[in-house]
Regions:
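Fe-S-dependent hydro-lyases/dehydratases of central metabolism
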Residues: 1-654
């Protein structure tokens, strides 16, 4: 009665793992309940999920039982939809996925109606209801549904995948999956695909030397653009995968699949996935998934000049929790209206939606802004071509053609930038008041909260004044997919400011800076910003002599590390055990960036670039006045709420 086949993939929002864990908490509101740090009752487990606990899944009753089978834990019926049961019966998903694709192709070729023997797609339609942005994208990319069908959230369908990303720590598993399904070449329907080398960029150790070239050779032969050339025809690139995927996504109607939870592009809609789903997307150009509900996020008010856009991102989470009490983003699509920001800056928001526990996110952009973003994408793809990264199939050239076509459609008015219908239905609507954001915001792991469930989440957002300039900072880190070129320029500008006022700059804590891409480093060198970073650095990466082992000890200096994930990933290098780290990165989980010591818990707090830089210089969190002085004259962000326009309710153009 227990299904344990590794190829049975229950990766939709109702998968077994989330069903088991999300239904396992209860709030004791009795008078004798324990109160946590936020004056709320501590959440309690209904049953243990400690390592070693044994459960039995009864697939006939669709329920989870204890080891003895005499006590029901939770109902799992939502995980046993017809499509998933079909996978179980087949002993895995591959035969079903390929069978559906072959059958659809045959019917299209013969121009006959599809009468499938497989479980039909679940189609949900509400007459008179408009479409959210993600519903429009799914409708445009849906496969195996009747022509003219309109799909709303709750539908579960096959969709065309436009862009696929594989990263270097899960890529080996993806290659094994491709070999297992006897796939030898990428699907011709995939517009673009990239294999990164960013997660193992920090240290070129024995493991990386053994695995990375083998992975790159396989993926290059399969048809992906690869960060390293198997024949070393071009300089090895360790650019952060999400930045590259954001650049090669050249259509705001795209669906993107990537082997990482931060696959959350600011053009199109992107989903992080397991290695098997990535392999299927590469081999078939398809994925099967439900259309999630959407939460609409808009902004009002005006940003203070001393605030960074990262503070808007954190404030969104804080204001949402204050407005609703519970996290309304969880498992949903966040449809964020950031029309005035270019794709690079907008990605700072869409990327963080992983920490908001959203299923994915979609950025609503204005026509002129989207055109500028696509022009930037074109130029960066051309740089990849100039470096020799193009493959035999001319994938990068085709991406430029797609971008040019999309720009032409927007300019002519034939197909403007994607927007939702004004009568679309949302599960919730969040309005972020920019006037309420007057000081930097920090995401705190709250490692000593009496409620264990409240530790190491991203929901504890605190203003900098909370720390009274007394929070010791042992290491600062500016890097990860959350930052862009503007962030590294801010580091340089702050050093110049402090040099003018103090004569020199010294650090009371180590500051590690890792630009996410080589393009950024090259542009900073041309613009004169890299030289000020070099002036104060005690270490600068050297591609001719990469580090062979992880750094164990840090001095109070500026480190200019190789582009890539660096400390954010935590798989190669970490801060010293027990350190308090202040970083621009994404994760604050226990043991990720810093492990506990025998004397003190390690903690990774997350903040904006200027807060991290200043804290490393001071060795502590700054006062609000110290912060304002340090960023004076620096243009931290150009974000302003987009002006609402009358929307066309017609969805015919998808």
């Amino acid at each position: 009665k227990n299904s344990t086949n590794n190829n049975t993939r229950l990766t939709n929002e109702n998968n077994l793992e989330s069903t088991i864990t999300n239904n396992n908490v209860t709030k004791n509101i009795s008078s004798n309940s324990t109160i946590n740090n936020d004056d709320n009752p501590v959440l309690e487990q209904k049953y243990s999920v400690e390592t070693g606990t044994v459960f039995k899944i009864n697939t006939k009753e669709k329920k989870l039982f204890n080891e003895q089978g005499d006590e029901e834990m939770v109902d799992l019926s939502s995980s046993f939809n017809p499509q998933k049961v079909e996978f179980m019966k087949a002993g895995g998903s591959y035969a079903i996925v390929f069978g559906k694709k072959l059958q659809s192709f045959a019917c299209e070729t013969l121009d006959i109606e599809l009468k499938s023997a497989y479980a039909p797609s679940k189609e949900v339609y509400h007459p008179g209801q408009g479409l959210t942005a993600v519903e429009k994208i799914f409708n445009a990319n849906a496969l195996g549904v009747k022509k003219g069908s309109i799909l709303h959230s709750g539908s579960d369908v096959r969709v065309k995948v436009n862009i696929v990303g594989s990263q270097d720590t899960t890529g080996l598993m993806t290659s094994q999956e491709l070999e297992a399904m006897a796939a030898t070449v990428i699907s011709p329907t995939v517009d673009g695909a990239y294999q990164s080398g960013c997660h193992t960029a920090s240290v070129w150790d024995f493991k990386a030397q053994e695995n990375t070239p083998k992975l790159m050779k396989f993926m290059h032969k399969f048809g992906l653009i690869t960060a390293r050339d198997p024949k070393e025809a071009y300089h090895s690139m360790t650019d952060v995968i999400h930045k590259v995927l954001n650049d090669i996504t050249v259509d705001d109607w795209s669906i993107i699949i990537g082997g990482d939870s931060h696959t959350r592009m600011s053009k199109g809609v992107a989903f992080g996935a397991d290695s098997g789903t990535v392999a299927l997307a590469l081999a078939t150009g398809e994925a099967t998934m439900p259309i999630p509900e959407s939460v609409k996020v808009t902004f009002k008010g005006k940003m203070s000049s001393h605030m960074d856009f990262r503070d808007v991102v954190h404030a969104t989470q804080a204001q949402m929790l204050k407005q609703f009490g519970d996290n309304v983003f969880q498992g949903k699509i966040i449809e964020v209206h950031l029309g005035t920001l270019l794709a690079d800056q907008a990605f700072t928001f869409t990327d963080w939606t992983a920490e908001m526990k959203a299923k994915a996110s979609i950025c609503i952009s204005e026509d002129d802004t989207l055109i500028k973003s696509l022009e930037i994408a074109k130029s960066r793809i051309q740089i990849m071509i100039d470096k020799g990264m193009e493959n035999d199939d001319k994938m990068l050239h085709r991406l430029i053609q797609i971008a040019e076509k999309r720009i032409s459609e927007i300019k002519s008015g034939e197909k403007p930038a994607l927007i939702p219908d004004n009568n679309a239905k949302y599960s919730a609507e969040v309005v972020v008041d920019l006037d309420l954001i007057d000081e930097p915001m920090i995401a705190d792991p709250d490692v000593n909260n009496i409620d264990v469930s409240k530790r190491y989440t991203h929901d504890t957002i605190r203003p900098i004044s909370y720390y009274n300039a007394e929070k010791k900072v042992d290491l600062g880190f500016v890097g990860s997919c959350m930052v862009h070129k503007g962030d590294v320029k801010i580091v340089a500008q702050m050093l110049r400011n402090l040099e003018k006022t103090s004569g020199k700059v010294s650090f009371k804590a180590p500051l590690v800076v890792a630009a996410p891409t080589y393009n950024i480093v090259d542009e900073l060198k041309q613009e004169g910003d890299w030289s000020i970073l070099q002036k104060y650095s005690g270490f600068e990466f050297d591609d001719n002599s990469p580090k062979q082992s992880a750094r164990l000890d840090y001095e109070n200096i500026l480190y200019l590390e190789r582009p890539g994930c660096n400390l954010c990933m935590g798989n190669q290098e970490k801060a010293a055990k027990g350190d308090t780290v202040l970083a621009t990165s994404t994760r604050l989980f226990q043991g990720r960036v810093v492990e506990d010591s025998s004397e003190k818990k390690g903690e990774s707090l997350l903040a904006s670039t200027p807060v991290v830089v200043l804290s490393a210089i001071l060795g502590r969190t700054p006062t609000i006045d110290e912060y304002k002085t340090a960023v004076e004259g620096i243009d931290l962000t150009k974000f302003a709420p987009p002006i609402e326009k009358a929307q066309n309710t017609s969805s015919a153009h998808f």
